[in-house]
């Protein structure tokens, strides 16, 4: 019978409660999680809490990692925006994703304002999906607008990408 492997940083139910209250153990678990991928502080706190670490130990571990520069929500937000914009996602969808990950609105707005031309991104997403030709019919224009809206672009970005004029449509 195969034994179930338990991650070394996860406190087991039969372990002592001192380990769950130990900031060093919480820090080791946080470093192990951050080694896999960058996480915002809110999501890292949730993961440490779900692994049974005491809130005080979690707070101490997160503050130590933040002071060392290993945990930086601003860096995470900028990297996330750049990555998702490169995948053709718009600012509305990216904002919703970052809010769900627990980032403050000020960081989200700063990351979205940092050098991405959202109109050009919307146009590029439209061209990748539908080709270079402009939508010929109102039905095709609406189809492309729905696609861009699903991707998270605002109405202004969609109008610019589809060449729609609100006065003539």
Predicted segments with their positions:
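An alpha-helical, amphipathic repeat domain used for nucleic-acid recognition
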Residues: 1-169
């Amino acid at each position: 019978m195969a034994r179930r492997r338990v991650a070394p940083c996860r406190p087991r139910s039969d372990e002592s409660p001192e380990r769950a209250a130990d900031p060093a153990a919480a820090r080791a678990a946080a470093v192990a999680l951050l080694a896999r991928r960058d996480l915002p502080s809110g999501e890292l706190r949730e993961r440490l809490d779900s692994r049974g670490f005491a809130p005080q130990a979690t707070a101490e571990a997160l503050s130590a990692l933040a002071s060392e520069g290993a945990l930086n929500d601003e860096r995470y937000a900028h990297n996330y925006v750049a990555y998702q914009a490169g995948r053709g996602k718009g600012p509305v969808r990216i904002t919703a994703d970052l809010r769900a990950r627990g980032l403050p609105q000020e960081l989200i707005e700063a990351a979205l304002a940092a050098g991405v031309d959202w109109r050009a991104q919307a146009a590029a997403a439209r061209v990748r999906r539908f080709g270079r030709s402009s939508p010929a019919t109102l039905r095709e224009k609406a189809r492309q607008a729905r696609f861009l809206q699903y991707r998270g672009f605002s109405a202004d970005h969609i109008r610019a990408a589809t060449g729609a004029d609100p006065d003539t449509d």
